[in-house]
């Protein structure tokens, strides 16, 4: 495989080696952050950072079966456990059927529950789902209260409902020292 170029300020441009991908089968169930906190005896919190319409990039368009550049609703939130920032959540939804996301209260609640209460649809599986390590950029570092460059878990996940229909797509940043995955 081919690498890609990475610019490092003050150091130059380097070729980054292609990553090896190992498939680990994930169970066909989706646990929300709110549920994970409850199971660990912690109180989940959420603060909305942004809520806006964005143009679908190639990957998002492919997942939703839309044309590249089609409108999607992006909801970005910081999720906390007992008041400590753990997750910078970026969920993308198709506009059709999810217009209410522009107006409803999404602080200190499960977005999956909020959507389910209005649509009867809940995420039941994720495909694709990829977990890798990424360094915190300026936005993620600010929201998660970690240094720029801090290693974070980065999850790309497409969520499907019980009928196998596309539900939402998440691009999530987790603080590794504050979160663990049971795969």
What function would you assign to each model-found segment?
Residues 65-68, 81-84, 95-97, 102-183:
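C-terminal regulatory/effector modules of DNA-binding transcriptional regulators
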Residues 34-35, 79-81:
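Short, charged beta->alpha transition segments
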């Amino acid at each position: 495989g081919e690498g890609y170029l990475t610019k490092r300020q003050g150091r130059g441009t380097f070729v980054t080696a292609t990553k090896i991908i190992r498939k680990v089968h994930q169970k066909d169930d989706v646990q929300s952050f709110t549920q994970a906190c409850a199971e660990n005896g912690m109180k989940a919190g959420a603060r909305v950072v942004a809520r806006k319409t964005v143009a679908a990039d190639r990957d998002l368009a492919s997942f939703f079966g839309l044309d590249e550049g089609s409108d999607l609703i992006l909801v970005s939130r910081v999720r906390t456990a007992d008041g400590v920032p753990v997750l910078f959540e970026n969920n993308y939804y198709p506009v059709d059927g999810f217009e209410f996301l522009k107006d409803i209260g999404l602080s200190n609640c499960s977005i999956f529950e909020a959507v389910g209460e209005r649509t009867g649809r809940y995420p039941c599986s994720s495909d694709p789902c990829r977990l890798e390590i990424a360094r915190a950029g300026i936005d993620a570092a600010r929201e998660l209260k970690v240094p720029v460059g801090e290693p974070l878990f980065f999850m790309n996940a497409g969520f499907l409902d019980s009928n196998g229909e596309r539900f939402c797509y998440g691009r999530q940043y987790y603080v590794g020292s504050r979160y663990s995955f049971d795969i």
